[in-house]
A protein has these predicted regions:
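Structural motif
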Residues: 29-33, 63, 112-117, 121-122, ...
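Alpha-helix C-terminal capping segments
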Residues: 54-58, 135-143
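Polyanion-binding loop/helix "lid" in catalytic or ligand-binding cores
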Residues: 77-86, 117-134, 163-192
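Generic hydrophobic/aromatic pocket-lining and core-packing "Φ" positions
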Residues: 49-52, 103, 133-134
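N-terminal glycine-/serine-/threonine-rich phosphate-binding loop
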Residues: 1-63
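Glycine-rich phosphate/pyrophosphate-binding loops
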Residues: 140-158
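Active-site catalytic microenvironments in core metabolic enzymes, especially phosphate/sugar-handling
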Residues: 45, 51, 58-61, 65-83, ...
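Ligand-binding beta-strand-loop-alpha-helix segment within the catalytic cores
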Residues: 71-120
Length: 192
């Protein structure tokens, strides 16, 4: 019974810590880009969908931008992700490309927009979802832009014991000067 009480107290503590953020981000638009789902297991992807639904349930307005694995039909993948969100209890609908009027209508009508990047002539097999997410965030005047990655994060030290959970652009610039980061780092943060 003591373990159960500890767990309840721990969860209550987390909620109390989160309350100011919940209040601050009520009705704020958050664009979430998560690249290809291939680096997520089924369980991890389901947890991600639950986290997105949690953001929605506390009053945020999430917009999901995703990539499509090479060789997969982008519309089928888009529909699959929207369905995963719906299975978590929210309304979600997939669209292709950046149409801010449609995205705004979807948000206003309590839907989570699920967006796959699209090239106008449909000749490109892959369009970087990070660029699409950035474009949507700018055009929708989003309050937050979140890039999810298979990498654990930016380590605070060379021993790789602790990561940044929040980092500013000036801090990133300083780290780039101080450390030798792999090429993937620049690609992830948009310098590549």
């Amino acid at each position: 019974m003591d373990k159960e009480l500890e767990l309840v107290e721990h969860k209550a503590s987390i909620l109390i810590d989160a309350l100011p953020y919940i209040r601050d981000f009520n009705q704020k638009t958050v664009v979430i880009e998560y690249g290809c789902a291939e680096w997520l297991s089924g369980v991890e992807e389901q947890r991600l969908m639950q986290d997105i639904v949690l953001l929605k349930s506390v009053g945020m307005r999430p917009i999901v931008v995703h990539a499509t694995r090479m060789g997969l039909d982008k519309f089928r993948e888009n529909k699959r992700i929207a369905k995963l969100l719906e299975l978590c209890g929210v309304k979600a609908i997939g669209i292709c490309g950046v149409d801010t009027e449609t995205i705004g209508l979807m948000l206003d009508n309590d839907y989570i927009p699920v967006i796959v990047p699209n090239d106008i002539d449909n000749e490109s097999e892959y369009i970087d979802p990070r660029e699409t997410a950035l474009e949507i965030a700018e055009k929708m005047q989003a309050d937050k832009l979140v890039y999810l990655s298979k990498y654990p994060g930016i380590y605070k030290d060379e021993e790789r014991k602790d990561i940044y959970y929040k980092i500013t652009v000036p801090e990133v610039e300083k780290l780039r000067k101080e450390r030798n980061f792999p090429k993937e780092f620049d690609e992830i943060i948009g310098y590549g």
